[in-house]
Amino acid sequence: MNYNPLHLLPLPPTALDPKPIPTSLTLDPFSDVLWVGASSGIVSALCSPLTLARNVHFPAHGCKIGGGGFSAQGVSAVREVRVTDRDVWTLTEGGIGGRKRGGAPKWIVSDVTRSLRTMSPNPTNSHELITGGSGSLLLANTARGEVVRSIENSSPVVKLAPLHRTVLAAGLSGQVTVLDPRTGFKAAQNISPVQAHTGGLSGADVQGNIVATWGWTHMQGHPLPDPLIRLYDVRALRPLPPISFSSGPAFVLLHPSSSSHIVVSSQQGMLQTIDMSLGPSATVFQQLDVSSYITSMALSSRGDYLAFGDGDGQLHVWTTNETGENAAVDENGSIVLPPFNGYDGVKPEWPDQVDPLPTIAWEESTPLNLVGMPYYNEALLSQFPSECYATSTSPLFNPPATIPQPVLSSMKMVDFVGYAPNPKELRGKRYVLRAVPGAEGRARGKGRRDSGPRFRSEKDKKGTYKDKEEIEEELNDGEVPKYYRKVEIKYSKFGIEDFDFEFYNRTNYSGLETDILNSYTNSLLQALHYTLPLRAIATAHICVDCKKEHCLLCEAGFLFRMLEDAKGRNCQASNFSRAFSATSQAYALGLMDENTNSKSTAPYGSLIQNFNRWLLSTFSTESIVDGETFHLRPFPQKTSGLDGLSMNDGPSAIDQVLGVKIKTTNTCRHCGFVSSRDSTLHVVDLVYPKKMNPRLSFSDILRSSLIRDSTTKAICSSCKAFAPLDSRRSLSPSSGHPLPPVLSVNAMVTNSDVYGFWKDKKDVKEKDGVRRFLPKRVTIREVGKLENGQEEGVKYSIRSMVVQIQESPDAVAHLVSFVKMPSKDGSSAWIMFNDFLVRPVSEDEVLSFPDQWKVPAVIILERENAEELLNLEVLPKELDREILFKDVSIAWNRKQDMIKHKILQREEMPKRGTLVAIDAEFVALQQEEMEFRSDGTKNILRPSHMSLARVSVLRGEGEMEGKPFIDDYIHTSEAVVDYLTEFSGIKAGDLDPNNSPHTLVPLKVAYKKLRLLVDLGCIFVGHGLSKDFRTINIFVPPEQVMDTVLIYTLPGSQRKLSLRFLAWYLLHQDIQTNSHDSIEDAHFALLLCKLWMDYASESEEAFEIVMEDIFAEGKKLAFKPPSSAGNMMAEQQLSPVSFPPLSNGDQTVARAVVKSRMATPPPPTKLGLPQWASQNSPSPLRR
């Protein structure tokens, strides 16, 4: 295998190094790129073996050249370059750094000792990198950009290389060792180190299971280059036959694709290509064209390219491919060579080409806005704040009133200025000039529409906004009120917690957020929630043993319970949306909202009506569990079950509330055969006459939609002829209750002609001069009463309504619901739900349809005697407590040693006030969407979609205090885009029933356990619980939450302390060193809570002093535990009171000051909790 010269390229000089030399070369196995690290600290990417065009050029971290956030720490050569499929890692003696392939920096880690020489990725953790040199080995976290552990090493390290599950370490002393990450990178117990070279080791290379080393030997007490290349099998470091190289090896490269080939070079450029399988006869000798010495060498992934650098600053590229007369050429006669990485992998990414400036034909009629805006970094004059010019006296927004005629008649002009006396009839207080009411408000409203919604961070110290803008505004005729417009959640730098939902909702009724998939269902869910019989069935359904994983009725029951408990706080239907999205039938019916664009003009009115029809039918099916359902009305039944359930002889519970009993009679015109069948309608679709009749009322159209005649052609079941069939649909007389307590109606307004029935009409006979189509009450007469001519019938009143809002045909459409809230005194108030905007409205406004911007979609009617017809007392009110005593898992391969919890005993049943510690871990189902502005700032459009992956709940009291009784991993069938292993500890396969070794349960099972603990009145202890509960999609009353994030804070400070910092400072424990563990986090949150309770029971002043000391120390350490703390913890077993002093003198003094002010807690008990946490002293919160 001969290599032929292809390129000779000198490295460009720099200001700090006029003659840089190549010190590290890497031929990219993933892309057609040669990475060159130079003695100047510059890293360059050269693309294509034919051109070596420069693609990327940046300084490595640790060199003196700054930029991109990299510090200047002295001139340092690039010692190693490693490439992954996404990133580029560089190493100098001063530190390591990671960048994207395009050169953008991602992380840096500095070494103050400036002793680094080599690095290797951790084969068991993709976020960790181990480096070494003359000092200790450092384990760096590439996600956080910090050293997480320091590992003592007896000898300087020359080379680190990743193996299958271990790391190879070649020491300067000549010893080769295999390090095991599972034991803290100590020497592997089953593989003994070997002494490869007696005089020291120069380097090593690894490919597959083969290790090649070269170095020095001793002869008569003097070091000489060892002529033997040592080979070892890495599986046991078993020596293989060595290879002789008399010139003294300086670089040895194992062929990546052929394990029998080795490329060896001496310092002077003597090159040998050795085939170990064929022996010395197959060895190829070549002399590299260098006049000095070889400084670096690299081999491509296929072995067909060889790159090396020399001491004169030249970069050489040789190849085994033909480059002479026999070389392959293209149609233009140019030589064709394969890429550096072969024909696999990805193409190098080049920067976007700058678009040429457009040519403008400049004429007198050319508008000035054809000239684009330049990039700017300060406010433009056009951003002049409105409050500076749109004041109450501004002539721009407050045009002057017309001057009265008496003033004009007596006015005299002097130098273009008019003067006139004020007549007596225009004098008095009522003629004093005043500001036009609402003018300044209109200006602010216009500005607010451009600037976005409210954030809590915009409030002043008094908790109010600087201006007094309200959602209400003055309107012109035909203008859509502001509170009807589509609302969106915006994200500030503080996240979703900074968004002020209270600005949009000042009622006791909770709204629903919009940033979830299929959020168009929010309006109907609100309408169904305030339909009390349906709410009662849904909340009772969660109390039975429903085994369907994605049960919409269960999720609706959980959502309705959350809306009940929240009492005005914002909620989200994320779990309902997740179950809905997992339903294949909904996909087939086209019920999914595929329009993720916020400017979509989708017809949501039609979509919500189809969803209403399908959802109620699904509810009806799901309300029957194991053949049993609730009997709320008197129906014949044979056998009664337990807890209000009975055998399914009659209709389902949903049918009893919403089902319309219909009888359809078909008569064949050909043979006269009559057939009939009974069915149940859950939704009535309104059918309008072809010609508009202004005399028709809503009751007439509803009656004609229930009882109607039609003609169709079909095959007669009697005569088998394809003949016309006369079909008549009517209320079933055989059913005792043809009309249900609740009637769901789809408006079916599909065009402007149909909307003509609904549009308000002027009528002087009405009080306000407007006749509305939708009445407050509707009367429907049943079949028997119709035949007898009686006027009485079933009376319904409107309970709720869903309408579509669309300001214009090309505007964004969305849905709004109106709900009539009953009260104990008999009065009722109407509430509008525009997602998370909730406000009261008048009944006339609800029933009014002034124009096509407001179109009805779903109307829910409730019988005025519904409470008398339904016996809701048979419904269960409490969840089954047995779920806390069952050990449920759907994992096929659960391992006993992975079970870390012990389920509750019956005598441990929690009660009101019982302390439990909780923590949860999550995975990402969808990455966040954001936009980057030209000034470098970013705006989050949609946050990442997180899903519960693990939840752990620990006992907070009793003999087994601190022991988990829930440790459930959550089965996730959706595609996971990021397991967030570093932060969650969740790995691929942990959430799969076929592969998970843990306790794996469906989301609904874990949710039921948490829901039961909330209902029992438990007090939840944890750190950052608001985010956890939000993602779990459960509302816990504030009086049942003890969040250490809120406990350990200073009044008026925005800083939230991390659990790791608090545990390090107060409990003297270093946690979360490798990844997060929910049991560990919950345990330490419980310890911190108990510590706070201990301080609070003694003196509030003592706790305030401790908090001041914590923040003072945190400012010195950037609120991060020193990395040295982890090293000290690993060296010795410490109790909370034996924490050693830190190396820094100031930190030692600060620690001593804090200790002097703190009451030192006693040593830990056998359960790991301090004795003060085990005492039966009453909690200060329970007092």
Curated annotation (Swiss-Prot):
Organism: Cryptococcus neoformans var. neoformans serotype D (strain JEC21 / ATCC MYA-565)
Location within or outside the cell: Cytoplasm
Region (Linker) residue spans: 331-478
Activity regulation comment: Positively regulated by the regulatory subunit PAN3.
Chain sites annotated for binding a divalent metal cation: 919, 921, 1028, 1081
Chain's role: Catalytic subunit of the poly(A)-nuclease (PAN) deadenylation complex, one of two cytoplasmic mRNA deadenylases involved in mRNA turnover. PAN specifically shortens poly(A) tails of RNA and the activity is stimulated by poly(A)-binding protein PAB1. PAN deadenylation is followed by rapid degradation of the shortened mRNA tails by the CCR4-NOT complex. Deadenylated mRNAs are then degraded by two alternative mechanisms, namely exosome-mediated 3'-5' exonucleolytic degradation, or deadenylation-dependent mRNA decaping and subsequent 5'-3' exonucleolytic degradation by XRN1.
Catalytic activity: Exonucleolytic cleavage of poly(A) to 5'-AMP
Upper taxonomic lineage: Eukaryota, Fungi, Dikarya, Basidiomycota, Agaricomycotina
Annotated segments matching region Disordered: 439-470, 1155-1183
Domain USP: 479-864
Intervals holding WD repeats: 150-189, 289-328
Name of the gene encoding the protein in the UniProt record: PAN2
Protein name: PAN2-PAN3 deadenylation complex catalytic subunit PAN2
Enzyme class: hydrolase
